[in-house]
Amino acid sequence: MTTYDRNRNAITTGSRVMVSGTGHTGKILSIDTEGLTAEQIRRGKTVVVEGCEEKLAPLDLIRLGMN
């Protein structure tokens, strides 16, 4: 599933991202999309990033690189 970060860059599983509030970087391990609309996915805490204990909203992420 593709969703979009805070700058409207496409992010998917495997994308390298930075958490805007903390500066933590990592790869997206999964995006929970089951039964959700695109808007709910983008605004809800649906993304698991390696090294982060809690799920994050795509709007809290910034894509790093072009992957």
Swiss-Prot record:
Modification sites for S-selanylcysteine: C52
Signal sequence annotation: none
UniProt-recorded name of the protein: Putative selenoprotein YdfZ
GO cellular component: cytosol
This protein's UniProt keywords: Selenium
Disulfide topology: none
Domain of life assignment: Bacteria
Transmembrane segments: none
InterPro entries listed in its UniProt record: Se-bd_putative_YdfZ (IPR017704)
Gene coding for it: ydfZ
